[in-house]
Amino acid sequence: IRLIKMLQKFKDPDITANGDKRASVPLIKAKTLWFNTGTLCNIECVNCYIESSPKNDNLVYISPDEVSDFLDQIVERKWATTEIAFTGGEPFLNPNMIEIARRCLEQNYKVLILTNAMLPMMRKSVQKGLLELLKQYNEKLTIRISLDHFKAIFHDTERGKGSYDITI
């Protein structure tokens, strides 16, 4: 009986295993579409919602073609999306992050990338790619750097010893 009840919860996506109507929110105005670029990260933050770390590769990197497919769907569905945002893990560990951002910018979306601004972002190929994108798309590209506190001791408590100095 327990197995049957468990399987029933997957029978109808709108009904819970107890027969109650499942809560839902209709997607009608997605102004910003968020992508998780993968679960790998160069640090381990205690507050990370997805438990990203240097070893957590549970979520594979999203590819440029997958993002392009979603961009096509935005157009097909006539959504009012104006911004594409990326989080992770650390987005700049995804080897395709610059190309992914370029595809979004080429289709006239604003792009927001959340980063810890540490070693992955300091790679020459990433810096070169970002400079090219900034030169061409300037104000359409926003890089938001995670800084948890203006004092190193509190930031480091969240993100690891020494992370404040590296970020700054």
Task: Please report, for each region that a protein language model flagged, where it lies by residue.
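Conserved alpha-helical substructure of the radical SAM core
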Residues: 3, 7-88, 92-110, 120-123
